[in-house]
């Protein structure tokens, strides 16, 4: 089984940032595994513009953004694919500063995916980027650990 960690390639692509003063944005960031669908109100995310020449020259042609851990934003075409393939995900509209059609991908529920016996083992896995998984993830296309 191949397991992939979703994160953004910040060295090559632009990305979206959330407004941390926006209550709705903070609620998504403070994920507890619950559904956010009922009562969802789209919040605004800002395209990172950059300050240096290198940052300003980052590629803006991307279909997903995951700058902040746990906040995955996907473009409409990718949202369509995910909605057909994945049962435990909500695709919730967000407002982008550059008027692109993006959604917040809320993975509903948390599972004990990582196999470790103590905090030290968990820290070693994090440092080495070599993870041991429980069998509970065998049939899941996308999941979020309870940590």
Predicted feature locations:
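Phosphate/anion-contacting hairpin/loop surfaces
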Residues: 1-147
């Amino acid at each position: 089984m191949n397991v992939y960690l979703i994160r953004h390639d910040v060295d090559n692509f632009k990305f979206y940032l959330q407004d941390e003063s926006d209550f709705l944005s903070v609620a998504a960031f403070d994920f507890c595994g619950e559904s956010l669908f009922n009562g969802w109100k789209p919040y605004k995310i800002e395209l990172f513009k950059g300050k240096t020449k290198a940052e300003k020259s980052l590629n803006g042609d991307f279909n997903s953004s995951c700058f902040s851990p746990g906040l995955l934003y996907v473009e409409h075409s990718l949202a369509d694919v995910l909605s057909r393939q994945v049962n435990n995900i909500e695709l919730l509209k967000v407002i982008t500063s550059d008027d692109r059609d993006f959604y917040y991908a809320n993975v509903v529920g948390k599972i004990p995916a990582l196999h470790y016996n103590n905090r030290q083992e968990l820290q070693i896995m994090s440092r080495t980027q070599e993870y041991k998984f429980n069998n509970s993830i065998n049939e899941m296309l996308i999941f979020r650990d309870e940590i």
